[in-house]
């Protein structure tokens, strides 16, 4: 028997997570070129760390971000700019548009993975698909 790539449960969780992410951020803020929602507070720090890192040359260690800081160099880790995504997207910096941001994508991934793993854990404990789907909705809507 051929194994399915995606089950309907994963599709339901994906669509629900995406819908909640649109509700949470707004459709316009889910655009990768919209930085207007990243100009205040900690979000501005995340975006600035990413911009300095994106515009700098490749250095070793990979997360080194010497232009971000006043007198001493820093690392992408200390600006909370999600180093895994920062290093990944820096590889493609010549193909990205100038005002690129990946934080809305990161928020969606966090919500979806929280839903998916909560479904898998609850299903492992109960073996009940409807109960697992409904329970995982609570994990989607309680963003921690």
Annotate the PLM regions.
Residues 18-114, 142:
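Membrane-interface coil-to-helix junctions
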Residues 1-15:
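N-terminal membrane topogenic signal
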Residues 11-15, 87, 105, 133-137:
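Hydrophobic alpha-helical transmembrane segments
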Residues 98, 127-128:
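Short, well-ordered coil loops that connect the C-terminus of an alpha-helix to the N-terminus
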Residues 13-17, 22, 128-132:
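Small-residue packing motifs within transmembrane alpha-helices
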Residues 108-124, 130-144:
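Membrane-embedded helix bundles of polyisoprenyl
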Residues 2-4, 124-127:
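Positively charged n-region of N-terminal signal peptides that target proteins for export
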